[in-house]
């Protein structure tokens, strides 16, 4: 196989319900490998009904403009039976280049008011970043990452023994 090894470090903080995730990719093989995407965090099994996504829109003279969206407003209508709910729809929020807050802040908030629960995330990077939410059967999946090949033409050649760290 490729000889690529991924190690995930999770840092917890006393008294605060926060965790920091960092992934390290090491080429333990004998040939160069090209990395085009590395997830920083993935959360699946997010309850489908009753969620709201808060997206922080940003601009040069209008910063921190949080907007609340229902998933129906974002194009996730319930059109299929419960056992096969999958719209193939993806909501993507991202930035390319070295101005990390050009259109959006590198964060988001998923709220479920009925259960008084929520999940907030922040991508710690001063360059390109990406997050997406998709539906899979009867739940949502959140993927958070730094730069990737599709949005920002990111690629990293890992020579044997080299390591790359996610944002």
Residue ranges and their predicted role:
Residues 1-136, 152:
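Polysaccharide-binding surfaces and accessory modules of carbohydrate-active proteins
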Residues 156-167:
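Short Pro-Gly-centered flexible turn/kink motifs
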Residues 140-152:
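Short, structured beta-strand/loop micro-motifs enriched in basic residues and often containing a Trp
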